[in-house]
Swiss-Prot record:
The lineage of its organism: Bacteria, Pseudomonadati, Pseudomonadota, Betaproteobacteria, Burkholderiales. Its EC number is 2.7.7.6. The gene is rpoC. It holds the Pfam family RNA_pol_Rpb1_2. This is DNA-directed RNA polymerase subunit beta'. The keyword Magnesium applies. One of its GO terms (molecular function) is DNA binding. Belongs to the RNA polymerase beta' chain family. GO terms for cellular component: DNA-directed RNA polymerase complex. Zn(2+) 2 binds at residues 813, 887, 894, 897. DNA-dependent RNA polymerase catalyzes the transcription of DNA into RNA using the four ribonucleoside triphosphates as substrates.
Amino acid sequence: MKSLLDLFKQFTPDEHFDAIKIGMASPEKIRSWSFGEVKKPETINYRTFKPERDGLFCAKIFGPIKDYECLCGKYKRLKHRGVICEKCGVEVTQTKVRRERMGHIDLAAPCAHIWFLKSLPSRLGLVLDMTLRDIERVLYFEAYVVTDPGMTPLKKFSIMSEDDYDAKRKEYGDEYVAKMGAEGIKDLLEGLDLDVEIDKLRNDLTGSEIKIKKNAKRLKLMEAFKKSGIKPEWMVLDVLPVLPPDLRPLVPLDGGRFATSDLNDLYRRVINRNSRLRRLLELKAPEIIARNEKRMLQEAVDSLLDNGRRGKAMTGANKRALKSLADMIKGKSGRFRQNLLGKRVDYSGRSVITMGPTLKLHQCGLPKLMALELFKPFIFSRLEAMGIATTIKAAKKEVESGTPVVWDILEEVIKEHPVMLNRAPTLHRLGIQAFEPILIEGKAIQLHPLVCSAFNADFDGDQMAVHVPLSVEAQMEARTLMLASNNILFPANGEPSIVPSQDVVLGLYYTTRDRTNGKGEGLVFSDTGEVRRAFDAGELDLNARISVRLTEWTKNKETGEFIPSTKLWETTGGRALLSEILPKGLPFSNINKALKKKEISKLINVSFRKCGLKETVVFADKLLQSGFRLATKAGISICIDDMLVPKEKHDIISRAQKEVKEIEQQYVSGLVTSGERYNKVVDIWGKSGDEVSKVMMAQLSKEKVIDRHGKEVEQESFNSIYMMADSGARGSAAQIRQVAGMRGLMAKPDGSIIETPITANFREGLNVLEYFISTHGARKGLADTALKTANSGYLTRRLCDVVQDLVVTEDDCGTQEGSLMRAIVEGGEVIESLRERILGRTAVEDVLHPENRSVLAKAGAMLDEDLIDELEAAGVDEVKVRTALTCETRFGLCAKCYGRDLGRGGLINIGEAVGIIAAQSIGEPGTQLTMRTFHIGGAASRAAIASSVEAKSNGVIGFNAPMRYVTNGKGELVVIARSGEIVIHDEHGRERERHKVPYGATLTVKADQTIKAGAILANWDPLTRPIITEFAGKVLFENVEEGVTVAKQVDDVTGLSTLVVIDPKRRGATKVIRPQVKLIDATGNEVKIPGTDHSVTIGFQVGALVQVRDGQDVGPGEVLARIPVEGQKTRDITGGLPRVAELFEARTPKDKGTLAEMTGTVSFGKETKGKVRLQITDPDGKVWEDLVPKEKNILVHEGQVVNKGESIVDGPADPQDILRLLGMEELARYIVDEVQDVYRLQGVKINDKHIEVIVRQMLRRVVVENVGDSSYIAGEQVERSAMLDANDALRAEGKIPATFSNLLLGITKASLSTDSFISAASFQETTRVLTEAAIMGKRDELRGLKENVIVGRLIPAGTGMAYHEARKAKDLMDDAERRAIAEAEAAELEAATATAPADAGGDSPATE
């Protein structure tokens, strides 16, 4: 059998492997791979096209050119297999060995491997503890290195120039050895004793921070060498392997020219220089000539390995840099990304898509010709089985002739054989779905309208690809997992993906609207059949209000049977007819309203939860049919008279123009600054635009009609444009506003707003100037879109890469940890309800009823819709749930911590690749996000000019913990907290709203006061920021000197003067002084902060207007100074995609705020130039201090007590600080909330758990702090799971485990620092990753998906996970079996020797 296999050389499936190890090749290893030395640079003889002997394509070394035929033609055919021809020396075998046989070049002088030299950090430099510059000088023959100092005072490793060398030669003679080039470096490497070095370094791990870091790096490297058995001198090459010739082909073109791989050129150069050097050495040429040749050889080898890494790249004849071995594997077109991660697929086709409204959800229309081509092999086999064709060739002929029997067979073959459709770009898993093909005429693929939103497809010329799953297993997976009717929810948020859009929505909306005084209003019907007859007879309008007796089916929870109940409903004709398609178990109330797009989505969602998948799919198909039919019947059209321009528009605009004139007037007379004028003008126009659109929508949305009693009543309008927008079919209020209201303010390309608005609308038409202004925005939009797509794709790629190995690996990790979830309330509005946050998660502990403490949900229960209804009814406002971050599963996640699989609606299955799903969910809507950076201070801050806050609901007032306030002389409560919030609770004590209140606001409510909706809670001056005193006393100015720290400003108009704090360094003041106020009590002493001996000091910031005089009496809550908000610099707020990327890359924001490092009391130390020294003293007297630039806004004052992690200097928080001071949970909350803010602004819903999954991966590395008994080095970064495993092992042995701290890495860093070198190399920085891995002798355990794709195995996710587990179990059983057999044999042998007669052994002693 073996010989038979050999005969056809069919590769048997490779034996299984569980890991891949990478290392460095020793010269012996390279020689053992080689089949001979390449001595000549010749390639092929260009007349005979035969390879030259000993050349780069030599047949003797690499194998024959024709199958089973030697070069000279002496031996041909299979019978001479394995013979080596004595004439030409070629082995008679298959030609494909030319793809696998390697050669080698013996280098006349050693050459350093450029990767270990130049890939930063330089490994050679680390090992030898020399600088890269020095090593380069030695390698490229500019300096000598001492390799053996002998008895001289010279130091080993020291560098000397030519002149030094000559001088020392004269001085010491041959006492010492110094060498140049790679030989010198090689000698040094050979002279290293790893054990000695390691011991030395281990003892040296003390001293300065930098030294420790460097030593730790060296130590790690040395230990890696020792562990992997790699000798450092292998970093210098003596032998160069030569790639098999068929992998660097040379192809003759017609006309006597050749197309060749660049590698051949590079190899030729190496061989040429090498043989020249060999000749020079044999001739004993002068040192300087040989040296030059050696340098050139080193450069040639460098170029071959990595061209352009050092110096100028070698170029071919056409001035193009040659593609070296390194270029072959890196980058988008390198081996990893081009061939291993992205392969071309056979059995696939592509075509344009069109609409297939008659298809069922799980079907697609496949053009006959395409199907014939794709299913050819199946047809061939059927033809043979039926005996119509005897050979494949005959079958082929039969198919090509296109006889009727072929089409019959095609129908048969295609039946129940799903195909997969894919639309590029495939941004999430719904971008590939399986369908059952239906054969159609024509050449376009027909697609079901409802799956368009999942594919993001439209029919304006989109193309889609078809793939055929061939094996039975593949067909089974396609059918069960990928069939379109099994994927009706978005994995990103669990909402239905098969929601109708556009005309279907319009049809359903029109049908379910009600009209006053429609034909047949007030009729009563006994069932829907009667309604249909009346409608068909023309006696009934769809929109007429009628009464119908309808039967509803409710499901009995115990038995699962449907029980009918009948009652009379007041409804409309259209709704009654629509009720015929409702599935059993879905109440009529769900469609007894005007169905807008959102409502239809809800309807399908409810149907899925209540009636299950199958019913829902059927229902969706019926909805689609009804929608199309009714939209056609409704005959909604659009005409210019539908665009009603409001009469009030003219007045609003002229009023705005008048206001703008007034402001211009004020500006001219110097009352307002240029910036204020611009802001106010933009503000006026913004408000007016909104007003016009409000008036317009009010006019569009209502119409007056006569009811059947002859009275005039208002009803919702049947205006076509309004209906399209209102139903969600097409268009929006903003677009209607441009058509029929006014276009409003336009932005310049840089994002700033042009202050003259476009007052016209499209109905009236724009004039030239207005048209010109509006082209600005349109062009910016187009340019943005192109950029956005690329950036969004790159973000998705980085996200996928960081989470690609995260798979659900077990049911339950048994953790008791979790996160406390409550509704997110901002500015009084519930942005995300508790329901949305906990739906589909697992409770950590029992959820109790707030009043009677009964258990509502048990610990470990999945919180589904029904349970959450109960929780909401009971008034639970916070629940502790399990999250991906707190999951304790090693190398994966557990199903309980992840919770519901949003795409399928049940608990997540083991083997689901939740990481990839999370990355796709976040990346897919990326193209919808903006690329914009908002300029705050322009009109974008319009929203910020709020001056009061009012309650939205009735309830009881409460304040949050940081809220502090004082009562001033007028009895008003003045807020002195920086992060105070007013909370409103309902009668159950549930939080209803939460409002932030700025520092210096006046509260108009007290704690525990009951208020009604609409009550004002607090108000403040939005244009200035006050500086307030908390204590009473007499004002004592310090350092308030006119002309030094303050300047007198006289107002031109009013003639009043105020003091303005100026930056003292501008006025040539020698020492930096800070103007401030102290308070003096009645006895003349300084007022102290209660409980401390700090005096009350209140500092003034630059730009503050001082409001009090020296010696004035002030009470608590009084304003000492005001800072005009206009004086604040406009700061850019990063929005959209760049913000999301910034968060996931964990970048430190520019102008970041400072958080308190510890809990304690604030004080200010001695100032330095331009900086304030801020100190915090904790209760034990430990002091932490920070220098804060003067222009920063400091949020605390002398003597204030702050908590660890509280914000003390204004600015965006740094995620690293949050992790360090507040811990992982707080960090996760911060990233989740910030990312959600960006998506929410665009109206995109993403479930929190996807972001948590990414954050888990960003936190997957830890830093070793205390080594304990582990083999780690302090400061080393380790995979968290590996660390925990190692610690468990140490504890089991009773040793001291290592301690570690959390490390937050950005997604790019995290991807590159993964333990899998294959995955990291295929992501970015291929050279660096591979160099490091080779030196460390790394093993890749092939845990992630990417590694497995690259090595060509099934991925360990989904069905592949079960396969790998079964395989491993079988291997274990086989091992055990082998062991058992061996043991049995040994036992038998032993028994045999024991029972053998004693004399048989000759002189063996008798057994006693």
